[in-house]
Amino acid sequence: MTDIAAPPAPGTSPVRVRFCPSPTGTPHVGLIRTALFNWAHARHTGGTFVFRIEDTDAARDSEESYAQILDALDWLGLDWDEGIGVGGPHEPYRQSLRRPVYDDVVRRLREAGHLYESFSTAEEIEARHEAAGRPKVLGYDGFDRDLTPEQVAAFRAEGREPTLRLRLPEGRDYSFDDVVRGRIEFKAGSFPDPVLVRANGDPLYTLVNPVDDALMGITHVLRGEDLLSSTPRQIALHEALVDIGVSQAVPLFGHLPYVTGEGSKKLSKRDPESNLFHHRDRGFIREGLLNYLALLGWGISEDRDVFSVEEMVAAFDVADVNASPARFDVAKAEAINAAHLRLLAPEDFRGRLVPYLQAAGVLPAQPSPEQLERLAAAAPLVQERMTLLGQAPGMLGFLFVADGDVVLEPDATAALRPEAADVLDASLAALEALTGWTTADLEAALRAAVVEGLGVKPKFAFAPLRTAVTGRRVSPPLFESMEILGRESSLARLRRLRATL
């Protein structure tokens, strides 16, 4: 027998919330939004954030997915006070290791009359509905609630093994105050007695999730809207757990809004935007993504979208979460991320560019001091222009390649105007005679040679130089880039393009 200590009742102790994902697939932004809101509620109230894993589905669970969940939480800085890797008074925190606990609770529920054996097959249930003229969608009909010993013996003689169902009170309406949605009511008969244990003895999610919440003293169950319909069954089980002394009270429930994609459809795992790591790979920083995920159902004020995670924690109240579906707007997410990039200290921003430049092959695994010095000079040129760190290779790659290897992008060369050759000739003449090579020196000399000397409008004057130096139509500021490249590289690139015209 497992010794189970009753936890404190909700409202009589500090807040205890949990994040309990199943390790199936890559982390979904909706899942991580749920983790964020639970974490923020715990941090705001001075409560406890518990992290456990619901890994009882051997056919779908994977260690790879488990590792990805840990990676996601670690990257975002969503730390937990109790659970996986941290420990605590309710170990273990993986459901697959808690079978003795569930078996003991099942035994106690059976002894108290809250569970009963159910032998009915799906086909038999459907046949009874059809014979009675009832809709088949009603599901289980309660046939096994009061079987006689003779009926049970007959079923067992046929070799049948029963499932175990929770005996719901007859004629009972279930209502509760959802901390997000307000008063919600489920009428009696709108849901059947749920199966809690399979015929082979394996406990189902419908049992283990509420049991863990009860034993771990969870005071607030904050979860996705898709689980709202299961709440009355869970409340009924929690009441049974109170009756047998496993729990002291039913936790409070709050159901967070769906995260939708284009067309207001629920964001599917098949949608790229649903994959948390897709956004990290594109160059979202944790501050920007956390800020945007917070906006999927909550806001710090009506006139302010950009805030730090510390400001979120200080202001977060789960009662302020909006129940309406929240659309994942990629453009808005990128704008939020851009704002956070601009808020980074220069050295922090520079450091975050390095992995993206390395992944693209722009920088080696061990950049040289010269490369790091060049990056330090160039990073401020793009910090105000960048929305995603993944743009770094395209914006800065030209600074880290040999002069002859600069890729002249087709759209850039195609946009060159007829006077491009004259512009390059005049620029080369002016620059070759230049003694200084500062941004100010370069701008003064080139404006005098091209804008004043050739009469080319400033709008078009420097496009050939930009293409020659960077290979692109759009780049970091030209004169600053040429200063960083230095005299020899800049002149070599101008001559290279001129030779093609």
Curated annotation (Swiss-Prot):
One of its GO terms (cellular component) is cytosol. SUPFAM superfamilies: An anticodon-binding domain of class I aminoacyl-tRNA synthetases, Nucleotidylyl transferase. Its EC number is 6.1.1.17. It is found in: Cytoplasm. ATP binds at residue 269. It comes from the Bacteria. Signal peptide: none annotated. Disulfide bonds: none annotated. GO terms for molecular function: ATP binding; glutamate-tRNA ligase activity; tRNA binding; zinc ion binding. Keywords: Aminoacyl-tRNA synthetase, ATP-binding, Cytoplasm, Ligase, Nucleotide-binding, Protein biosynthesis. A motif ('KMSKS' region) lies at residues 266-270. It catalyses: tRNA(Glu) + L-glutamate + ATP = L-glutamyl-tRNA(Glu) + AMP + diphosphate. GO terms for biological process: glutamyl-tRNA aminoacylation. CDD domains: GluRS_core. A motif ('HIGH' region) lies at residues 21-31. It is an enzyme of class 6 (ligase). Its main location: cytoplasm. Belongs to the class-I aminoacyl-tRNA synthetase family. Glutamate--tRNA ligase type 1 subfamily. NCBIfam families: gltX_bact (TIGR00464). Catalyzes the attachment of glutamate to tRNA(Glu) in a two-step reaction: glutamate is first activated by ATP to form Glu-AMP and then transferred to the acceptor end of tRNA(Glu). Monomer. This is Glutamate--tRNA ligase. It comes from Kineococcus radiotolerans (strain ATCC BAA-149 / DSM 14245 / SRS30216).
